[in-house]
């Protein structure tokens, strides 16, 4: 899995890194008009924001969820911009004590947008502080210790909380129920990713043909963050191995060098599928046995490698283990067999 501040171990890893943050900000759309894709989400937010502005009220608390790299942070920034408000940003793992959250809340100005990334990782004691802040714009603070301790109530200015998570199922019901707006971000189709690549190429000053942008988009696993990362690497290839212009052939040659195929799969994806098909007869195979067979950690397979393979229909997760689909057999050029006809391992 990617390190928070180093480069991603896989170029197609959708998780962001600290090294990429400045580059992502430079490519980020700043308004709903500039935002590409997520049509339903964009249209709903436009209505909610215009209505809130018309009433001179803060936007209802908003929860954004979906896979990494789809634009949750971007939307939080856009919400603040569209509301004419300042954005204050934090994350669940950073807010490990009630006092940490209280310090942020008490420094908010009226109408501010507070963005908490990975909100599912808030501890229960910090969540308890958040409940009255979200509902009543107040917090209860305990002053002193022992018998002399007393609780005081502090009023907060009206604000909007925007929470983001890749794992909405881990949110507690009391927290989830306090969000008035809940939006799910989905993977992007190739045509929308192509527009994102073309827009980013313009920002980077890279000459890109439409077919070249589409070739990058096709391999970006439905994820703008991956598309922008691939664009930067293809730009390097075009400058060194070609005339600096990204054509379809230049993009394809660069992707071959980067070992990302036309389906957006890399060597790690293919190793997993080959192990299920060739070593375990197509499955079902337990995750521990599969991890041992290809020399990867169980958590890496479960959280990083498997989700895209399952989404694209190459792999099935069953109660008996992982099973390769006909789609996987076709990809590997192996005559297919009925799913689950292999032996049970693990």
UniProtKB/Swiss-Prot annotation:
ATP binds at residues 27-28, 69, 72-74, 135-137, 178, 188, 225. It comes from the Bacteria. GO terms for cellular component: cytoplasm; Holliday junction resolvase complex. It is found in: Cytoplasm. Transmembrane segments: none annotated. The keyword Lipid biosynthesis does not apply. DNA binds at residues 298, 317, 322. Its EC number is 3.6.4.-. One of its GO terms (molecular function) is ATP hydrolysis activity. It catalyses: ATP + H2O = ADP + phosphate + H(+). Keywords: ATP-binding, Cytoplasm, DNA damage, DNA recombination, DNA repair, DNA-binding, Hydrolase, Nucleotide-binding. It is an enzyme of class 3 (hydrolase). One of its GO terms (biological process) is DNA repair. Residues 1-188 are annotated as: Large ATPase domain (RuvB-L). PANTHER family: HOLLIDAY JUNCTION BRANCH MIGRATION COMPLEX SUBUNIT RUVB, PTHR42848. Belongs to the RuvB family. The RuvA-RuvB-RuvC complex processes Holliday junction (HJ) DNA during genetic recombination and DNA repair, while the RuvA-RuvB complex plays an important role in the rescue of blocked DNA replication forks via replication fork reversal (RFR). RuvA specifically binds to HJ cruciform DNA, conferring on it an open structure. The RuvB hexamer acts as an ATP-dependent pump, pulling dsDNA into and through the RuvAB complex. RuvB forms 2 homohexamers on either side of HJ DNA bound by 1 or 2 RuvA tetramers; 4 subunits per hexamer contact DNA at a time. Homohexamer. Forms an RuvA(8)-RuvB(12)-Holliday junction (HJ) complex. HJ DNA is sandwiched between 2 RuvA tetramers; dsDNA enters through RuvA and exits via RuvB. An RuvB hexamer assembles on each DNA strand where it exits the tetramer. Each RuvB hexamer is contacted by two RuvA subunits (via domain III) on 2 adjacent RuvB subunits; this complex drives branch migration. In the full resolvosome a probable DNA-RuvA(4)-RuvB(12)-RuvC(2) complex forms which resolves the HJ. This is Holliday junction branch migration complex subunit RuvB. It comes from Halorhodospira halophila (strain DSM 244 / SL1). The gene is ruvB.
